[in-house]
Amino acid sequence: MSMHKALTIAGSDSSGGAGIQADLKTFQEKNVYGMTALTVIVAMDPNNSWNHQVFPIDTDTIRAQLATITDGIGVDAMKTGMLPTVDIIELAAKTIKEKQLKNVVIDPVMVCKGANEVLYPEHAQALREQLAPLATVITPNLFEASQLSGMDELKTVDDMIEAAKKIHALGAQYVVITGGGKLKHEKAVDVLYDGETAEVLESEMIDTPYTHGAGCTFSAAVTAELAKGAEVKEAIYAAKEFITAAIKESFPLNQYVGPTKHSALRLNQQS
């Protein structure tokens, strides 16, 4: 029996909670073989309030990693995460088109959770023009959705729906805006738009500050489900269930950060 294979083109989070570390843990939980093309290394300074330090990988090295996977192995689905330069965004887009990669999940990472500053504000245009049109699914959070749609801060479900329609118009087939617990709402709310219908996905509101890597984990779960052959909406619903369980059992890693628990859903189902 062949193993389903998924690729993540993303950054390394040295703390293990986000980036390729979260992606690989999620792929493993979903019984999908994970492969990586590393774009950037993110470290945190424990002597400076966990300040993020960002070290991009050169494009030749990324290109070599991608050739290893696309030419030497093949993939059933793929996702992007942190792409720290316009050149890397363009390389990812070129690879998707030239290799005719399918089941493409774009997680348009623009900030590190816990950091107040936007990492790469000048790259929103490149994400809009280069990657959004190639997305089977694009999974922005509220801030990223505002940047991609050109709207102001998204404060309501109606705002999320409007932004999703604008992002879909860029060429993405399915848009999932992850609002989570950020809206003033009694439930954790995401919005799914397929070009015709806007669907509000509600789940239990979980009162926790420990959500490091939640966006990476959600998009990786969508990717894994697509790699296994799931229909797009079913992949999104399954990913929502997966991340809800992971957040519900999230935990503090130190005084600065707390990741989600990737094994939570599996362990719950076994008990």
From Swiss-Prot:
Organism of provenance:
Bacillus subtilis (strain 168)
One of the protein's GO biological processes: thiamine biosynthetic process
Give the stretches traversing the membrane.
none
Is Lipid metabolism there in the keyword field? no
NCBIfam families membership: HMP-P_kinase (TIGR00097), PRK12412.1 (NF009077), PRK12616.1 (NF009259)
Among InterPro entries, the record links this protein to:
HMP/HMP-P_kinase_dom, PM/HMP-P_kinase-1, Ribokinase-like
Q: Where Mg(2+) is bound, by residue?
A: E144
Gene for this chain: pdxK
Task: Give UniProt keywords alphabetically.
Answer: ATP-binding, Kinase, Magnesium, Metal-binding, Nucleotide-binding, Transferase
What is annotated about its quaternary structure and interactions? Homodimer.
Name of the protein described by the UniProt record:
Pyridoxine kinase
The job of this chain, per UniProt, is described as: Phosphorylates B6 vitamers; functions in a salvage pathway. Uses pyridoxal, pyridoxine, and pyridoxamine as substrates. Can also use hydroxymethylpyrimidine (HMP) as substrate.
Under PANTHER family, the record lists:
PHOSPHOMETHYLPYRIMIDINE KINASE, PYRIDOXINE KINASE
Substrates-to-products reaction catalysed: pyridoxal + ATP = pyridoxal 5'-phosphate + ADP + H(+)
What GO molecular function terms would the record report?
Answer: ATP binding; hydroxymethylpyrimidine kinase activity; metal ion binding; phosphomethylpyrimidine kinase activity; pyridoxal kinase activity
Give the similarity note.
Belongs to the ThiD family.
